[in-house]
Structure formats: structure tokens, C-alpha cells
UniProtKB/Swiss-Prot annotation:
Protein name: tRNA dimethylallyltransferase
Binding site for substrate: 16-21
EC category: transferase
InterPro entries, A to Z: Dimethylallyltransferase, IPT, P-loop_NTPase
Region described as Interaction with substrate tRNA: 39-42
Gene Ontology molecular function, alphabetical: ATP binding; tRNA dimethylallyltransferase activity
Keywords on record: ATP-binding, Magnesium, Nucleotide-binding, Transferase, tRNA processing
Highest taxon listed in the record's lineage: Bacteria
Cofactor: Mg(2+)
Catalytic activity from the UniProt record: adenosine(37) in tRNA + dimethylallyl diphosphate = N(6)-dimethylallyladenosine(37) in tRNA + diphosphate
Flavoprotein among keywords: no
Amino acid sequence: MGEVQREKVAVIIGPTAVGKTKLSIDLAKALNGEIISGDSMQIYRTMDIGTAKVTKEEMDGIPHYMVDIKNPEESFSVAEFQERVRKHIREITERGKLPIIVGGTGLYIQSVLFDYQFTDDAGDAIYREQMEKLALERGVEYVHKKLQEVDPESAERIHANNVRRVIRALEIFHTTGEKMSDQLEKQENELLYDVSLIGLTMDREMLYDRINLRVDIMMDQGLLEEVEGLYNRGIRDCQSIQAIGYKEIYDYFEDRVSLEEAVSQLKTNSRRYAKRQLTWFRNKMDVTWFDVTDGEKTSEILRYIEGKLQLKSNNSK
């Protein structure tokens, strides 16, 4: 018997503000595709401006999945993301369409494409509570430092402010004696799909200028009011609020910083995040990069995907 044909998937990754959204919609139109968000924060309802969520107008009739599926107070795991996205890939393929994953959350996207296994082990609730208490009493940096001591690779990948993931990585080491990063490395080798994985990059100074401008536009669009709505609903200490764009403005509402300082910190954190994204993608995934410093490369990228996945676009003769 011949080899089972794997489902075709196009993936667009890259740092924040590089232009992934517009490209994905152009490609979906040309390739008869439907889009799956690979962003761990666009899943949350009412968190639109700070996550740079694709608007109905931008979607231009192209179906989008993994957007607005959770309330801000709900938690969400990479295992749940993996399960839901694989189901969407199957269903989109069955409809004769091309699944296009677009986003910047590297671990989430990687968990879908490769043969990652997530255990159903509930972990150690007592240990978890101890770590949560430590984070409250000694600060998140203290707990992050503990992770650096036992699993430096995960500590590098997981930001100190992402307390839940820091504690989860510590919990895995505590319960299994294995580093989370080692568990993932062991499962990283085999692609489950026929994948065209492309990345967008650009001159760093230009990217940073775009990020700064994007933050200014977000403020003009009403980011302050969006975050105030969440704050007034009593949403605290949730996974969603640890997102860049929300935690900084929360500091303002809690009188820890001025609004000017909050916006400045938001720009700094966004630039740092973009740098971490690029480092992660370059170290962890076999990406074909397209430099869009001098303008979009839609036609070139389209030709590349057609060749890699042996597709014909609507633009082809």
C-alpha cells in the first residue's frame, strides 16, 4: 500500500506588526483557503484592540477560526489549542479548502504541526499552590529564577510574567523529573502535515518603528477604554491579562505608573517580544523567510507555496 497522503497546510509566522494578517487574507483568496489564528491571545472575546485582532472588514469574507472562542476569565492551554486546530485542519481539508495558520505564538503552532503528546496528568496541586503562593509573596521573578535553575531552556522561552506557564514548567519537572523543554524536544522531529512554513521578517529598526506606531494607533482606537472595561469587570490574575497590551495598562489603573509610562512600557515590551519571537522561530523551526522591508512579497510567497504544496492558485492560468 502507498503512503497515506498528508493534509496540506500553509503556515505564516513572524513577529508582531510585520504584516501577517494582510498577507494571510491575500493568500486565502488566491489559494481557496480558510484561516486559523495561531495567536494565543486572539482567542479571547472583548480583547480586540490590544491583541490586534483581525476585524470583520479585514477578513473580507474569508472564514477565520480560533478567534473569540473564550471569555477573558477562562484559561486556555496549548493542549486544547492543538486539539481544536487539528480538528479545524481536518474539517477545512474535507471541504476542499486549504488551511492557513497565521500567527506569532511559536509553541502553539509547533504543537499542532509536530507529533507533540500532552499527558493528561493533572500534576501536583499542592506543589502548584506552593509555587503560586511563592509568586505572590516573593514575586514572579523569584519563581522564574527557580525555573532557570532546573530548566533554563523553558525559562528562556517563557516570560517571567507568564506565571501560569512558569509554574506549569516547574510542576512538570517536579512530578516527572524531566524538563518541559526536553519533553518537547523529543517530540519535535516528525511533521504531521505536508507543510509550507513561511516567515516574514524586516529590518529591525523599521519593525520597531511599526510596533511603536501600532501602539499609538491602538491608543487612538480605544485601548485604554477596552482595558478599563476588563478592569471594571473585576478580571484579575487571569491568563488573558498577562498579555502585552493589557498588563501595562492594568499597572496604570492600579496607580503603579502614569499613563505615559504605561504606554512607553507597552512599546518596550512589544519590541522585546518581537525580538524573542524571531529568535524562537529561527532556533526552533525550519522556516523559509521572506524579507518585506522593501514592500510586500505576496506574489513571490504565493508562487513558493504553490510549488511546495503542489497547488494551483486562482491567479494561475
